[in-house]
Amino acid sequence: MISELSKHILAAGGKRIRPIITLLTSKLCNYEGKNHLSLAACIEFIHTATLLHDDVIDESKLRRGVATANDIFGNKTSVLVGDFLFSRSFELMVENGSKQILEVLSSASSTIAKGEVLQLTTVNDCSTSKETYLNIINSKTASLFAAAAEISAILSNKNKLIQNALITYGQKLGIAFQ
């Protein structure tokens, strides 16, 4: 079931921009190890899990012009595979061995969930403020972009100035992307 749904997700396409951010910022930081590869996968697992859950919540039938996983496999399967991807991402974080990276990605995951809840409270509310809308975007999108960039600075043992610059870069890119 996981394999089948995973093939569907891969075939559905997508830009994979979040893991690409991790790969490119690792290069920017002159990182020479291999841990950025599993962390890029971790970032994509988190993102994909949120998409699976989001499609169930929104009762979506299409994503990127292709039938959603929940439309094909059902809500229960989509939620469980999303949970599996979250679990697998945390296994990859632990395997990496950096408590700081675990903290960054755990925080981003929590922020994404809070953004989803906030969005649920504003659905069909035309009086939603610009501030609330930006908070939703920051939570649901920019937080993972920022984390994807920040972990490269951590992996590369860069100072706080560079780490903060990459966080800002990720946040701004995430807002623009949304």
Residue ranges, per PLM feature:
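Mg2+-dependent prenyl diphosphate-binding active-site environment of isoprenoid biosynthetic enzymes
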Residues: 1-178
